[in-house]
Amino acid sequence: MKMKLATWATAALMAASPVMADLVFPSMSYRTGPFAAGGIPFADGYADYFTLLNERDGGIGGVKVSVPECETGYNTEKGVECYESLKALNPLVLQPLSTGITYQIIPKSIADDIPVHTMGYGRTSAKNGGVFSHIFNYPANYWDGASGVVNYLLEINDGDISGKKIALVYHNSSYGKEPIRTLEALSEKHGFELVTLAVDHPGQEQKSQWLQIRRERPDYVTMWGWGIMNQVAVQEAANIRFPMENFIGVWWAGAQHDVLPAGAAADGYKAITFHAVGTDYPVFDDMRKYVVDKGLAAGNGDQIGTVLYNRGVYAAMLAAEAAKDAQAATGVADITSSMMRDAMEKLSITEDRMVALGMPNFGPEFTVSCENHGGNGLVGVAQWDASAQEWNIISDFKQSDQDVISPLIKDDSMAFAAENAIEPRC
């Protein structure tokens, strides 16, 4: 009889104790379509980092993590459908990996109290957290990137690019158009001529644009491309013998698959970046031990160290660290999206923290606040070595021109606030 009572007591206790649900970090991926070459390694890195936390650490704060995927195909309509289906899973944060999708879900995420992290993409003026309460774009945004390109050109031209001609080749979408306003302002400030050339989706046809570049003879070309557009552009630049060292892509046009198809002709091509490249980080030793060697990798495990795999890992790490902060701040392990949002708004990533995570110097230090959802806006430059088939960082991470960018962010964000009857919070 005593044994039966003990059994009943145990069962009652288990029934009364809350069952910890997984912490849900959905992946809005695109493993199909013309941009799959970029979508796959990012999604793999994102998933693998959370698998590492589950296998090595038992999750985050003792709670397991799940990473449900929803395939968007980089299609805005499908992306919105994914948002609607994923929000039923109580996600802590969404990462749409598409500027078009981001624009569509901004009002939804605010209404649904779901934070959205658009790392290095999305609506740039979302840096103003006083207006965009649930959108974060740390550690850098497109306008930081545009300024980073100009800063680098100033650096290699002894601080003077007046009279130079810079061509922008851009994907003809909300994504590709993001840097134009900033580059126009910077051209007025520094006296260079800006030429803009749109490339229609998906970017396989670019001969007319590069023939125009051959006629215009710009000193430098910068590119806001993605997917197949990038490798076509690099090949077309090689075809007209444009100097690769004068061709600088955005961070979404600076991965291995963007340059490998052109072979030796891509040597010297450059791209801005907001994080490190390569495999020389202790976290990747753990990734091999706990994830790849156990057969748990999202892919086949051979993308570790590639640019976009690393970016997926970085995005997952930043999400996980915000979740840890939310747990610490609230004393609640099974945190909510609202708690996650509050923690993201106070996130501070220091070098000491990155060292402890096995990611020393993986990215610049940055802090987030109510007023600043975009971090510090530090931008570096990487260059492709075709013979070694590797990217190398060739500049320091430098501050973008906030004298130009901050007023643009204020103007755009306040216009959004007026249109949507939003009272700035800070």
Predicted regions span which residues?
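Periplasmic-binding protein-like
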Residues: 86-99, 117-119, 165-169, 217-227, ...
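N-terminal signal peptide c-region/cleavage motif recognized by signal peptidases
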Residues: 16-20
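Extracellular/periplasmic periplasmic-binding protein-like sensory domains
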Residues: 237-316, 423
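Beta-alpha junction/loop-to-helix N-cap segments that form part of ligand/metal-binding clefts
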Residues: 24, 37-47, 56-129, 138, ...
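Segments of small-molecule ligand-sensing domains
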Residues: 296-309, 320-395, 400
